[in-house]
């Protein structure tokens, strides 16, 4: 019987433009790009040059500090450009795709015949090891770590997030194979929604399955780790996106690196919200072309709370499960501002009268609606943070640079995304996710 854990802290933000369960196909796409910044914590070293021909699965760059960690091209084709920014930082590696795709053959494997070292070696060789993250530090993991557990959250609850039950349809065999492969390395814990009707997810082999019920961010893998396997200093837990599990399963079953994923195209400024199959590194222009309303819009590579601001010139992120388009809001003109009833506006603390109209989908824009101010100790964070940590005190310790206090308050167990809802409700308008990222990076440097 599946264990059920119910959380009560959090906030569900209902936004207009949720993707309907309709999947469309992209037209012909010729240009792709892999972005090193998608793999937090690595130092990229490019191993190809312009004009080189690569197969799908060949490395485009490696982690300079761990050269055995490769990052594979999503397509076969000609390396078109290595785009660099300030101080020669690698921004992306562009590949012009062949008309007919060729894959590097790593050979299909019987997962039952592999041990943990065999799985590690295969993932390193094929360029999929970098898709595994770790706690502490919420970074792409390294081969010198030994996890005490591996966590996979097989559902999503961020605003406008896609339904993983729908995304995984037809790929259940690959998902199970990926879970079995990871179980060769450490105990695998899979979180699913209590509402999930997918029998494969509910009856997974080689994993401990836990059903979760509660408001956002109950789906965050950091919440699962905090409840089931707290991370102490010196310990490591791996976290794997459910789509990366499918990538691993495909590699074992076919011998190919196939980075195709089903993403939600959502938001109030999307004409027809839907799902689409796209490779990692697909141009956002190809995904959104002809499906965005006119006017000033914010294109987000990811969900509205944790995604990054992007443009039509951007590329689908390595861990991105949705592309969102919402109003920018810079052309809004509201008479009398906050003093108006604002029946069409969302408020977490019922500052507006919209709550009288019952549950509904809101059309929110990208405005912060307020300036930065001193941190207010109001208990707001704790109301939406379903973890056994003192969120406000942890943020204060990060701002103060007090590493000892950060360790005592549980920084090893958190990722920036765990503070996404707290950032949304924060009266101080602080960029909490950026602060947590800064604190984790500082702590990592201190402990290296």
Task: List the predicted regions and their residue ranges.
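N-terminal, Lys/Arg-enriched amphipathic/low-complexity engagement segments
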Residues: 1-47, 62, 212
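Exposed loop/turn and edge beta-strand positions of beta-sandwich/beta-sheet ligand-binding modules
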Residues: 42, 73, 89
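Short, solvent-exposed loop/turn positions at domain surfaces
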Residues: 42, 48, 65-68, 272
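Short histidine-centered loop motifs in beta-beta connectors
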Residues: 43-53, 57
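Short coil-to-beta-strand transition motifs
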Residues: 68-76
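Buried, small/hydrophobic-residue-enriched core segments of structured protein domains
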Residues: 69, 83-448
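Short beta-strand and beta-hairpin "edge-sheet" elements
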Residues: 79-80
């Amino acid at each position: 019987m599946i264990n059920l854990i119910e959380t009560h802290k959090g906030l569900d933000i209902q936004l207009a433009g949720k993707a309907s369960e309709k999947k469309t196909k992209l037209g012909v796409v010729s240009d792709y790009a892999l972005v090193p910044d998608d793999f937090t914590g690595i130092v990229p070293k490019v191993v190809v040059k312009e004009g080189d021909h690569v197969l799908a699965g060949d490395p485009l760059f490696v982690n300079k500090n761990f050269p055995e960690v490769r990052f594979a091209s999503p397509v076969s084709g000609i390396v078109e450009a290595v785009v660099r920014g300030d101080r020669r930082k690698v921004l992306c590696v562009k590949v012009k795709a062949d008309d007919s795709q060729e894959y590097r053959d790593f050979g299909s494997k019987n997962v039952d015949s592999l041990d943990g070292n065999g799985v590690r070696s295969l993932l390193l060789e094929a360029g999929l090891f970098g898709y595994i993250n770790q706690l502490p530090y919420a970074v792409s993991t390294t081969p010198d770590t030994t996890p005490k557990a591996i966590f996979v959250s097989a559902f999503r609850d961020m605003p406008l997030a896609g339904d993983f039950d729908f995304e995984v349809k037809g790929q259940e065999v690959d998902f199970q194979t990926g879970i079995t492969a990871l179980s060769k390395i450490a105990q695998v814990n899979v979180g699913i929604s209590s509402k999930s009707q997918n029998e494969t997810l509910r009856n997974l082999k080689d994993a401990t399955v836990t059903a979760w019920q509660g408001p956002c961010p109950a789906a965050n893998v950091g919440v699962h780790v905090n409840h089931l396997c707290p991370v102490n200093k010196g310990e490591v837990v791996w976290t794997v996106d459910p789509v990366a599990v499918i990538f691993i399963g495909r590699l074992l079953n076919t011998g190919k690196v196939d980075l195709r994923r089903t993403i939600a195209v959502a938001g109030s400024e999307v004409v027809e919200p839907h799902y689409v199959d796209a490779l990692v590194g697909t141009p956002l222009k190809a995904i959104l072309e002809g499906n965005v309303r006119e006017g000033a819009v914010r294109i987000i590579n990811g969900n509205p709370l944790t995604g990054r601001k992007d443009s039509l010139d951007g590329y689908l992120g390595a861990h991105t499960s949705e592309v969102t388009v919402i109003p920018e809001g810079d052309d809004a003109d509201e008479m009398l501002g906050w003093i108006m009833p604002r029946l069409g506006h969302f408020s977490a603390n019922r500052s507006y009268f919209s709550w009288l109209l019952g549950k509904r989908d809101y059309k929110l824009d990208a405005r912060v609606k307020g300036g930065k101010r001193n941190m207010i100790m109001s208990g707001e964070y704790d109301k939406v943070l379903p973890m056994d940590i003192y969120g406000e005190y942890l943020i204060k310790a990060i701002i103060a640079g007090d590493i000892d206090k950060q360790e005592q308050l549980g920084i090893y167990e958190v990722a920036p995304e765990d503070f996404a809802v707290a950032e949304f409700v924060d009266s101080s308008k602080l960029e909490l996710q950026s602060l947590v990222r800064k604190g984790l990076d500082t702590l990592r440097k201190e402990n290296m």
